[in-house]
């Protein structure tokens, strides 16, 4: 047994409160090393005849990566206190693993209390809690300047005719909030029930990430009344809205920064920024990346903190928005985000807080900052397998597993899953315009735990390279839309909403990872219901014999996509590039 590979970290994603009563426990071992693991646990104060009273239960292997296996146990401590350890078994030995590491498995070890891990008390206040509604939300991201032009009188004077050319960095086409209101029937018919808008606040650019005034809507987008109408109509339709907050930096044309430029070290705003010396030049202050027109805010400054918190609360109080997406969230200090979380959650307990983080976001997802992150590390291996074809099926699955194991279950359940955005190539372009690959990728992502998001235009076959080409004008002429893709997305969204509880909370198990033939199968299981997915990315037809699957022959089986009933003895062909979803449930 490889002792050095055994890992468990208390008070982390390895040991946490799931719901204020239930504790989730994970331990990692070398892949293929352990035959089974027993979880020893009990209340630290409970003794019988002078000996600590311990319970014992088997752990379940729930995931594997290229190098490790992950094991899981779930317990409900009667008095919300927990003392625990592990007994790891292979072909040759049993070992005890606890707070002192690996120890011999014997009576003396079992009776040495300080060898055990402790979970002193399961506090609800310490439990990661996210808004329940996010679990059933399918998001639709809108870049307002390119979605729809509802009021041409608001368009910038230099606005180009809608969709007349591929967008340049500084082009305007006149998209606005009225355009979004006008298309709500379309969005409702598509099936999405959450709208994420990139920034709508006053700013000189088309993207609005260079904010002038966070309290006002950009005049080319509309005014407070049309935004109020948008929020109201969304809520009437059972839909949510999330705004984009740029709190890492501000626009260089903002009054605060211009005051610093004018008055130097005499400016009342000089400590709002990270300025190295005066007077301000193009290279003596911190900014977003190396972008001169986006000076970085000093969020350790109490005045800046109050300013930003007032903004966050204003849009909740005045317009009842449902969430904040936080731009460049990983470059803002944790202290501020903890204060932000407390303030906005007190104002609206079910507000959704989403951070833009492109790497592992675990430090921000401990229950006192964000509910979720934009889940690029989770979906990137999917894209690399299906679209880029640069990794194998097993490599993809291992990376997906590793990412899931790095998070708490309740955090994974509300993560923001996306395949493209205003910052990336569009999905169809990443797939080299192979529509089958794009469909397979979407179906694969929609089968995973988390809250899925599609970028405007994906549903009608919009393509585009990296920024600015990924920000094309939405196509509204039906004859120019890919209607087959649109119908596909409607069905995919409907299926996700229909099976939402299973796809959010159900167990993921990889049934087959055939690297040679590029054929994948996995299942999502919850209670008596199971969905089994098959993806054929190879060049050969694959045949599925239902009787060879792990399905009770008395179960009701159907093709989940077409809802066509199937029979236990059926054999189904999965063509190259296609996928199949089977549904099986115990008869009612």
From Swiss-Prot:
Where is the catalytic site?
A: 327 (nucleophile), 356 (proton donor)
Keyword Calcium set for record: yes
Give the primary localization class. Answer: cytoplasm
Q: How is the cofactor bound?
A: Binds 1 Ca(2+) ion per subunit.
The cross-references to InterPro entries, in alphabetical order and at most eight, read:
Glyco_hydro_13_cat_dom, Glyco_hydro_13_lg-like_dom, Glycoside_hydrolase_SF, Ig-like_fold, O16G_dom_2
EC supergroup of this enzyme:
hydrolase
Q: Where is this site: Transition state stabilizer?
A: 423
Q: Where in the cell is it found?
A: Cytoplasm
Binding-site residues, Ca(2+): 149, 155, 174, 176
Q: Provide one Gene Ontology cellular component.
A: cytoplasm
Needed cofactors, names only, are: Ca(2+)
Q: How does activity depend on pH?
A: Optimum pH is 7.0. Stable at pH 6.0 and about 80% of the enzyme activity remained between pH 7.0 and pH 8.0.
Keyword Isomerase listed? The answer is: no
Q: Which GO terms describe its molecular function?
A: hydrolase activity, hydrolyzing O-glycosyl compounds; metal ion binding
Q: Which UniProt keywords apply?
A: Calcium, Carbohydrate metabolism, Cytoplasm, Glycosidase, Hydrolase, Metal-binding
Report the temperature dependence from the record.
Answer: Optimum temperature is 40-45 degrees Celsius.
Membership in a protein family: Belongs to the glycosyl hydrolase 13 family. BbmA subfamily.
UniProt function note: Hydrolyzes beta-cyclodextrin to maltose and glucose, soluble starch to maltose and glucose, and pullulan to panose with trace amounts of maltose and glucose. It is also able to hydrolyze acarbose. Can also exhibit a transglycosylation activity transferring glucose or maltose to another moiety of sugars by forming alpha-(1,6)- and alpha-(1,3)-glycosidic linkages upon the hydrolysis of substrate at concentrations of 5% or higher.
| Identification of the protein by name | Intracellular maltogenic amylase
Name of the gene this protein is made from? bbmA
């Amino acid at each position: 047994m490889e002792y050095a590979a055994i890992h468990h970290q208390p008070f982390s994603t390895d040991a946490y409160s799931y719901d204020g009563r239930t504790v989730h426990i994970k331990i990692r071992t070398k892949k293929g090393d352990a035959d089974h693991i027993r979880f020893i646990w009990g209340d630290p104060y409970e003794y019988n005849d002078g000996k600590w009273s311990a319970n014992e239960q088997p752990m379940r292997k729930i995931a594997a990566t290229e190098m490790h296996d992950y094991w899981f146990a779930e317990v409900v401590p009667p008095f919300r206190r927990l003392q625990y350890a592990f007994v790891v078994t292979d072909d040759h030995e049993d070992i005890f693993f606890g707070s002192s590491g690996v120890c011999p498995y014997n009576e003396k070890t079992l009776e040495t209390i300080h060898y055990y891990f402790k979970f002193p008390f399961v506090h609800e206040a310490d439990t990661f809690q996210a808004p329940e509604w996010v679990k059933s939300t399918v998001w639709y991201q809108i870049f307002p300047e390119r979605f729809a032009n509802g009021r041409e009188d608001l368009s910038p004077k230099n606005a180009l005719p809608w969709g007349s050319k591929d967008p340049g960095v500084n082009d305007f086409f006149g998209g606005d909030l009225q355009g979004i209101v006008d298309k709500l029937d379309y969005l409702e018919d598509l099936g999405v029930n959450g709208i994420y808008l990139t920034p709508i606040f006053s700013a000189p650019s088309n993207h609005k990430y260079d904010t002038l005034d966070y309290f006002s809507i950009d005049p080319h987008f509309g005014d407070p009344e049309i935004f109020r109408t948008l929020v109201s109509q969304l809520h009437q339709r059972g839909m949510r809205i999330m705004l984009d907050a740029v709190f890492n930096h501000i626009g260089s044309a903002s009054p605060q920064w211009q005051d610093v430029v004018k008055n130097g070290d005499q400016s009342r705003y000089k400590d709002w920024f990270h300025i190295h010396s005066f007077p301000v030049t193009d290279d003596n202050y911190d900014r977003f990346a190396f972008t001169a027109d986006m000076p970085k805010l000093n969020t350790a400054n109490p005045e800046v903190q109050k300013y930003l918190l007032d903004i966050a609360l204003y849009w909740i109080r005045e317009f009842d928005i449902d969430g904040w997406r936080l731009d460049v969230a990983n470059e803002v200090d944790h202290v501020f985000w903890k204060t932000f979380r407390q303030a906005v959650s007190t104002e609206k307990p079910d507000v959704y807080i989403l951070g833009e983080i492109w790497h592992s976001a675990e430090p921000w997802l401990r229950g006192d900052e964000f509910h979720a992150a934009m889940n690029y590390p989770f979906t990137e291996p999917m894209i690399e397998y299906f679209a880029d074809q640069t990794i194998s099926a097993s490599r993809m699955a291992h990376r997906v597993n590793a990412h899931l194991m790095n998070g708490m279950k309740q955090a994974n359940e509300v993560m923001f899953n996306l395949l493209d955005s205003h910052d990336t190539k569009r999905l169809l372009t990443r797939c080299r315009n192979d529509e089958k690959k794009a469909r397979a990728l979407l179906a694969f992502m929609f089968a995973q735990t988390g809250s899925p998001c599609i970028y405007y235009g994906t549903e009608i076959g919009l393509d585009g390279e990296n920024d600015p080409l990924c920000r094309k004008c939405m196509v509204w002429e039906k004859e120019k839309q890919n209607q087959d893709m649109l119908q596909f997305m409607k069905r995919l969204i409907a299926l996700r909403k229909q099976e939402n509880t299973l796809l959010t909370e159900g167990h993921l198990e990889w049934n087959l990872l055939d690297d040679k033939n590029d054929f994948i199968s996995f299942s999502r299981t919850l209670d008596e219901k199971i969905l089994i997915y098959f993806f054929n990315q190879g060049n050969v037809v694959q045949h599925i014999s239902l009787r060879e699957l792990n399905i009770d022959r008395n179960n009701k089986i159907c093709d989940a996509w077409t809802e066509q009933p199937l029979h236990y003895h059926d054999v189904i062909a999965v063509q190259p590039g296609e996928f199949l979803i089977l549904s099986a449930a115990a008869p009612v």
